Amino acid sequence: MKKHLLFLGAPGAGKGTQAELLSQTTSYLHLSTGELLRKEIEMNTNLGIQVKDIMNRGELVSDELVLKIVRQNLVKDNIGWILDGYPRNLSQADSLNEVLSEINQPLEVVFYLDIPEEVLIERLLLRGRKDDTEETIRTRVDIYKKTTEPLIQYFKDLSLLEYINADRDLKTISSDIKQKMA
């Protein structure tokens, strides 16, 4: 069974949900970059202090800093891991592959959670978050298309990509993912 996994998909496609479900049934480490950054800040580590300072200025955390945090968590692996929310662009994907090669934990499969845009927008609006207006959601989807969608071809070229129809119920999606891990 594959044990070094990545979930890719638009905001609201269900990456975090599916990664967490899989983590619970496999004991694989679920590495969400957002949660990793928050954890570093909460623990007041040197990296966390840098991240907090950057975020307080309203800036994006650099690729290098995110990669450092991801790397230190991957090194802890002894069972398996699931990456969610990283990489977000081709540069990050190249850097991640270099790190995974260095620590001898190559990526084994990338699950692309594919979902129609209108279903995605409806799903995000139903979440009821204050910042989830139709306008902000469409902006996030547009940014995703420009920066993250090229990763689909990147991982397809590496023969790592598995398409998952994310416009179904949680159990069916989860079952599909587990079958493709075998």
Curated annotation (Swiss-Prot):
EC category: transferase
Binding positions for ATP per the UniProt entry: G12, A13, G14, K15, G16, T17, R127, R168
A GO biological-process term: AMP salvage
Localization per Swiss-Prot or TrEMBL: Cytoplasm
UniProt keyword ATP-binding, yes or no: yes
GO molecular function annotations of the record: adenylate kinase activity; ATP binding
GO cellular component, one term: cytoplasm
Functional description taken from the UniProt entry: Catalyzes the reversible transfer of the terminal phosphate group between ATP and AMP. Plays an important role in cellular energy homeostasis and in adenine nucleotide metabolism.
Family of this protein: Belongs to the adenylate kinase family.
Assembly and binders: Monomer.
Stated name of the protein: Adenylate kinase
